[in-house]
Design a protein with these regions (language model features):
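C-terminal motif of bacterial Sec signal peptides marking the signal peptidase cleavage site
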Residues: 15-18
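Positively charged n-region of N-terminal signal peptides that target proteins for export
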Residues: 1-5
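Compositionally biased alpha-helical segments
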Residues: 20-144
Length: 144
């Protein structure tokens, strides 16, 4: 009896803690995240889970226009824990933090780790699928 209860609690925990994934066509992404040459960025200060503060520039986007798996439009509140995953035409995936992703000329450049600040570039022409989700990491903006 206790074993069944523990299994039930485990399944419910997994179900409610999983991150919901949303989708975004490449065109919708480029409308929301234009090239850096055409937009004024805003300064934010974010606090990481350990309490360290980091100041950086972000696109002035309060909510991200995306779609659920059924194609229903959804607005996801932007924040420092939002992750964006690009799958290219060869099936390779790259995951960045949405607020640390930029479009420069014909490439998407993003930060893969807020701790190490690892950057990677992907040609826009090779992007096949874009997925967005709240990674539920304990990052938060403190100056908004």
């Amino acid at each position: 009896m206790i074993r069944h209860f523990l299994i039930f609690v485990f399944i419910v925990t997994i179900f409610f803690s999983s991150c919901k994934t949303y989708y975004m066509p490449v065109g919708t992404f480029l409308e929301q995240v234009p090239t850096l040459e055409t937009v004024n960025l805003r300064q934010v200060t974010a606090q990481d889970p350990l309490g360290h503060k980091h100041t950086y520039s972000v696109y002035p986007i309060d909510s991200i226009k995306c779609f659920d798996k059924d194609g229903t439009p959804y607005k996801l509140k932007n924040g420092p824990s939002i992750e964006i995953r690009f799958t290219d035409i060869n099936g390779r995936r790259s995951t960045f933090y949405f607020d640390r992703t930029w479009v420069i000329q014909d490439s998407v450049i993003g930060v893969q780790s807020k701790i190490l600040s690892l950057k990677k570039a992907i040609p826009v022409s090779t992007i096949k699928i874009i997925e967005v989700q709240d990674g539920r990491k304990k990052y938060k903006y403190i100056n908004q």
